[in-house]
């Protein structure tokens, strides 16, 4: 089947090193779009913010936490000029944007660009092609995304509606996050130095607000106002650093209509689970005669970790209008019944409900034939402690994370500029790939939300235990599998995805738990140029940051 057991070094592949041949001729083709050009400016600066009665200076975009909402239409060109006024290096990723032929705008530091240094600037310039729905943007350097994130809403083209009944109104997007009283850069730096697990967050947040279940936080409660008997569109984004989250609204049923900016067959649920990096669009139908003026919206963690984790519940308020009821306390709020923190069955049942529309207008273009079969093991492990150091990981080791037992080491220059010397997996243009991600239990079974840059993929199968290459493919869904950019490898299980490698460039794939990313759970695909000018990478921009 040609399944690689280890990552291949692109330096040994002459075809891989030819993939940037377009640069030799610099085919600076104009970007054709019928949409508008929308300009935004990001001034990245330190700002004092107070939560849980703790004031600290955090990185922000334009002084906002969370950052500004970006709104475009399908087909628009988005130009974001970033000015870094901090001492930290920074880069920004436009999570879920395909960046066709334009990896220079993708954003992960040392993969597609060197980071923007303090005092420097860079313009992210890209066109949103063939996508509509809810995505988001975030920093992609160290743990800076704990504060640097915001929604990216892609409206359908003018004149195009939704493939579901038009809602009465759209509610503001809700971004789930984590708040640390400590400096998060100090948290991860200490963990990497000692080899121990990092300290956990102090609270979960709704749009940066912890809510009334935490001490000194009642005034920092996020509220959503609705009217009785209406249907609203609600966009959810899990921007938490290290936690998958359950979500529910007391006494309300939700209808899921989109996942990762891809429409799905609508289904109802009282409780959702959403992994870091994932987005969902919901229809919320309010009660015609509500029994209470206010209801709790709650998030709580899902995890099977053997270590410590933030086992708290954050609450926001759904407030029916007109009402003057106080929503700052939590004693009288009806709370939604969320599953127990380690309820893997609830997660599996929810995940199994996702199906693509698979209609003529929104087809599921899942590859039926496969050119390349790849099996990657993903999980946690340990590295030996250096001889001159005392380490605080298991049995005096250092925590590590890996794909196929290889922990990714951050390069000193961007892979997109020097990919021939780095460990990547090369793919010929237009290769159809089946990727099986198998979880391991070396340091305990955990789920791993894997995010792929540059592509969406179809989730054709998943299960518990070890993947069976003989029998499991017979149960694949090749008719209407869900299309996503982030999928969670089940705890103690596997997931199979398929995608078409039709986007030339170097594309990162990594666990969206930032602690696992910091420990090395990532890799990169190198997709070679195709034969046609329209299948080759665009040349680098003149202001590309230098390392």
From Swiss-Prot:
Domain Plastocyanin-like, residue spans: 43-159, 170-323, 408-531
Organism superkingdom: Eukaryota
Reactions performed catalytically: 4 hydroquinone + O2 = 4 benzosemiquinone + 2 H2O
EC numbers, comma separated: 1.10.3.2
Cofactor(s) needed by this chain: Cu cation
Family statement drawn from the similarity comment of this UniProt entry: Belongs to the multicopper oxidase family.
Function of the molecule: Lignin degradation and detoxification of lignin-derived products.
Protein name in UniProt: Putative laccase-5
Species for this entry: Oryza sativa subsp. japonica (Rice)
Lineage: Eukaryota, Viridiplantae, Streptophyta, Embryophyta, Tracheophyta
